Design a protein with these regions (language model features):
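Conserved strand-turn element in the central/C-terminal portion of the radical SAM core barrel
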Residues: 148-150, 157-159, 172-194, 217-220
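Short beta-strand segments at enzyme active-site cores
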Residues: 82-83, 118, 180-184, 213-217
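Active-site glycine- and acidic-residue-rich loops that bind
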Residues: 122-125, 189-199
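Auxiliary Fe-S-binding modules of radical SAM enzymes
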Residues: 1-10, 16-19, 195-293
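Short histidine/acidic/glycine/proline-rich micro-motifs that form metal-
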Residues: 89-91, 187-190, 252-253
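Surface-exposed amphipathic alpha-helices with a cationic face
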Residues: 132-135, 167-175, 267, 271
Length: 293
């Protein structure tokens, strides 16, 4: 991406409180340092019209993000987990030069807040030192991995590091004692929803030291993201759009017809590998990590 394609904007705030309790990722605040994302994942929900983002390939940098974050963390009455990676990837290629995410982690460490990073990038391993420091309070890194097939991953997530590179970064973090795992989502119906697909991801996650794997055996599509997904998937898998439209119509949640079997296999597999299907969360009382179940 050329420098002239990047906008600089001034934000009014940097942390947004979730309206309801997050029992899946354990996040209380969302933090987005950038607007838009360079990874170009064809299934990205951020393209949905309801968010009002527009062209997500147009990247905007929040120039006052770190100043705002420092102030907001200073004035919070209690500590709760900050999540980053929901609307864009905090480790998109631009981060390598701008180091905005690293700057945010330095402030999170300074104020002793817990953090949960969700990413598709191996660049997160660069910040292992800070994540170790934050881990004294609570730090989790979840790698989104949809397939172990690097060629397929490149088609679905064209500008993101390969799945192999993500697993290598996961191993680096887990070897340093950082709590890490996999967000196995989305699982695209008729594309990467076989038992073999799930087995390969879970086994590689175990080899890389994952403590958990969080699955979703389907994909969410709504106005804005659906049209883009169909346009791109048709070029990769001709006639796949017709299959989706026939099977799912205009449903928001497009769950794999194999979901029941995948779910049963998944839970049996992770049990044999000693991996959990839910995360341990930060808890302010005594700063303990609590599991959902």
């Amino acid at each position: 991406m050329n420098v002239h394609e990047i906008k600089s904007i001034e934000a009014k705030s940097i942390l947004s409180r979730l309206r309801s309790k997050d029992n899946y990722f354990g996040i209380a605040y969302n933090m987005n340092l950038y607007r838009g994302c360079q990874h170009g994942c064809i299934y990205c929900d951020t393209r949905s019209c309801c968010y009002g983002i527009g062209n997500i390939s147009q990247i905007s940098v929040k120039k006052n993000a770190l100043e705002l974050l420092d102030h907001e963390l200073e004035t919070k009455r209690g500590k709760a987990t900050i999540g980053t990676g929901s609307m864009n990837d905090p480790y998109m290629p631009l981060e390598k030069q701008l180091r905005l995410t690293r700057g945010a982690l330095e402030l999170i460490a300074k104020h002793h807040f817990p953090v949960h990073v969700i990413t598709k990038s191996d660049l997160v391993a660069r910040d292992a030192d800070l994540l170790q420091d934050i881990g004294q309070t609570y730090a989790a890194v979840s790698f989104t991995i949809t397939t172990t097939d690097d060629e397929l991953a490149h088609k679905l997530e064209p500008n993101a590091p390969t799945s192999s590179e993500r697993f290598k970064a996961m191993k680096i973090l887990s070897d340093r004692g950082i709590y890490t795992g996999v967000t196995l989502m989305p699982v695209l119906p008729f594309i990467n929803d076989s038992i073999e697909d799930i087995e390969e991801i879970v086994e590689k996650a175990a080899e890389a030291g994952a403590s958990y794997v969080l699955p979703m055996f389907g994909v969410t599509l709504r106005r804005g993201s659906r049209e883009y997904f169909y346009e791109k998937i048709e070029k990769i898998f001709p006639k796949m759009t017709k299959r989706y439209k026939t099977y799912f119509e205009d449903r928001y949640e497009c769950i794999s017809p194999n979901a029941h079997y995948l779910n049963e296999f998944f839970y049996n597999k992770i049990e044999t590998l000693g991996i959990s299907a839910n995360m341990k969360f930060y808890h302010s009382e005594g700063k303990k990590q609590l599991s959902l179940f």
